[in-house]
From Swiss-Prot:
Gene3D superfamilies: Vaccinia Virus protein VP39
Gene, per the UniProt record: spb1
Keyword Transmembrane helix included in the entry's annotation: no
Keyword annotations of the record: Coiled coil, Methyltransferase, Nucleus, Ribosome biogenesis, rRNA processing, S-adenosyl-L-methionine, Transferase
Source organism (scientific name): Aspergillus fumigatus (strain ATCC MYA-4609 / CBS 101355 / FGSC A1100 / Af293) (Neosartorya fumigata)
Gene Ontology MF annotations: rRNA (guanine) methyltransferase activity; rRNA (guanosine-2'-O-)-methyltransferase activity; rRNA (uridine-2'-O-)-methyltransferase activity
Oligomeric form and interacting partners: Component of the nucleolar and nucleoplasmic pre-60S ribosomal particle.
GO biological process, one term: maturation of LSU-rRNA from tricistronic rRNA transcript (SSU-rRNA, 5.8S rRNA, LSU-rRNA)
Bias (Basic and acidic residues): 379-390, 460-483, 565-582
InterPro entries on file: RNA_methyltr_RlmE (IPR050082), RNA_MeTrfase_FtsJ_dom (IPR002877), rRNA-MeTfrase_E (IPR015507), rRNA_MeTfrase_SPB1-like_C (IPR012920), rRNA_MeTfrase_Spb1_DUF3381 (IPR024576), SAM-dependent_MTases_sf (IPR029063), SPB1-like (IPR028589)
Functional description taken from the UniProt entry: Required for proper assembly of pre-ribosomal particles during the biogenesis of the 60S ribosomal subunit.
Sequence segments annotated as region (Disordered): 367-416, 430-534, 549-613
Acidic residues bias (residue ranges): 438-459, 493-515, 549-564, 592-602
Listed name of the protein: AdoMet-dependent rRNA methyltransferase spb1
Amino acid sequence: MAIQKKHGKGRLDKWYRLAKEKGYRARAAFKLIQLNKKYGFLEKSKVLLDLCAAPGSWCQVAAECMPTQSIIIGVDLAPIKPIPRVITFQSDITTEKCRATIRQHLKHWKADTVLHDGAPNVGTAWVQDAFSQAELVLQSMKLATEFLVEGGTFVTKVFRSKDYNPLLWVFKQLFTSVEATKPPSSRNVSAEIFVVCRGFKAPKRIDPKFLDPKHVFAELTDSTPNNEARVFNPEKKKRKREGYEEGDYTQFKEIPVTEFINTTDPIAILGTYNKLSFEQSPGGDLALATLNRLEETTDEIRTCCEDLKILGKKEFRSLLRWRLKVREKFGLVVKKGQAKADEPEEVAEVAPMDEELAIQEELQRLQEKESAKRKKERRKENEKKRKEIIRMQMHMTTPMDIGMEQLGPGGDDATFSLKRVERDGARDVIASGKLAEIESDSEDDQTESDYDESDDEGDRLERELDSLYEQYQERREDRDSKVRAKKARKDYEAEEWDGFSDSDKEDDEESEEDGASQAVVKPAPPNSGTLSSKAAMFFDQDIFQGLGDVDDVEDEDSAIEMQEDDKSAKKGSALEKKAPKEAKKKAQAPEDFSDSDPEEPDDPRKKNGQLDIDIITAEAMALAQQMATGEKKSQDIIDDGFNRYTFRDVDGLPEWFLDDENKHSKPQRPITKAAAAAIKEKLRAINARPIKKVMEAKGRKKMKAAQRLEKLRKKSALLADDEALSERDKSQAIAKLMSKAVKKKPKQQVKLVVARGANRGISGRPRGVKGKYKIVDSRMKKDIRAQKRLAKKKK
């Protein structure tokens, strides 16, 4: 009988023979070829570093696939025979000498790809071999972080073991994409897999713990047991089959009950041990015997102590209460209030306050109140002066040619002010009407009273009308959704930003004298176009960041008012977000345009040069046609904007009246037949479009079809490049794949043939019927109806 030679556990397979035929130094070359076909990183690389490269098969593949004039460096502990276009040297990748040699060869270049296919000398023990290989991978990763370019690729071989997941976690911190794969040329019996890391993040600093094997592969300590959960929630306890504890193989723990009484952590004992024992030791224990004879130690307590693992929350609580009672009897518990029980209570006698002292305190309180009032008024006056000085510096004085010179600096009317009347104490006199008595006839008084009554009646009727109209509007909104949408649009358009509101909150009194000093600012020279340093500091506050430059708001005095209220600052936060961009744009603008009109409208053009205008009404279409044909000019349209309805006074009018008037109080624009037809055609085209869901469904269908075709194309390319298959097998496999992509024929419907006339009692296929068919008759129809009727009755 012939002796069958063993080929090293199947090492001499087809990849071994192909490597011999192709001239590769090892069968591992096909692993890199298959990885490159899947990820395509060699063609994009100009600098490659191969760690643990002996005998050099990966360097051979890299020299074939990479562009010419590429730099390929291979390093290993074992010597590597020379390879064309490859720089090789012998060194240990964990030493500083290897780093210096690589740096010398690369000079100022960075590696686009780093390969690592190394493994330690195996054969001692699988656990030790796996850890050594994981440690070697981490060392190669450390070397790759020094020489890899940002966005580079790192390919390494890893053994599947308990250290695989920590390695993968480290890779994911340093790379954007991490994938583990096993190429077909890798033997199935081998525990090796290849991890392809793409998109190196290139951080400026890497924590040394990331690349320290002691830290990365450290075993996590078990967390402390949660004894409270075992005691107070025993029904929620889940079994964890983690084996036995070290040195404890019986899983039964017993402890004397005296230790449970004396311990400071009874919950830990109840959660850890199985039994609290009352049994006496050979020498005897007096405390244990006393515990057993106590009145509190009932049979229920003894039964609960026999097996702690089967107890519930109620039994655990009774054991804890029993422990407290026993500790009180033995004197182990000291009550908190016991030490202070014998001490006499100190009673503080409060002497009655003297009458003179009470008067002095009242006077002092009134003086402080008056002082605070004066401080508040002084602060307001200083603030008003400071605002006036800033207005003068910014040339924002009130124009004298429109009759507003009588207004005060704060915008108050100087001719009459209620504040001044209140300060003089004459408000009550004016309100009472006793300033001047005028004789009047009794008839005039009667007439005035009648007028007052009629005015009250009119106000009441107006209020009733308003309330009835509101109820009518609410009923319309409940019935019609279009009315609700119209009201929502109206409310949204009516919203306006009211600016900053004054606040009555008082500031701290520590800034009493600061207001007057801050108000003294040197006046700016008349020719200077910039603010003074004080005003610039004032307008650098956060509250003015969203209001633009000073030149843009010269005519808007109210927009410059500084407010001290926190709520107003929150309202202005929406404007503050846009302030940096606007300030940056204005800083880059040339000085020639600083005096331009701030109200100049923005250019409505898009980036492609087309106007951002959509004509949706027949009136607008007719107007556009007139402008396009030259019948009307822009000045004519501006003139048409001034009509009898432009300045219609609507102040004080009720809402129901305005809603009715707005239907008719507007100019009637002429509409041409061509404009109406154009708008109708436009709406027809819009309505002809499918709805959004249908368009999305069609888009998804097209996208999935394209994805399937791309997938089939890649599979067919892989089959075409497979050297192990013959041409016939390749063509059959590709044809089979492409047949799946062909659109399936619609399912043929079953044709119903009524069994009457020539088809009554027929046994075969009816004449003239092709495809699937089913013969039906009136009896079958009645039976189906009866079945449906019975099923409905059962419900």
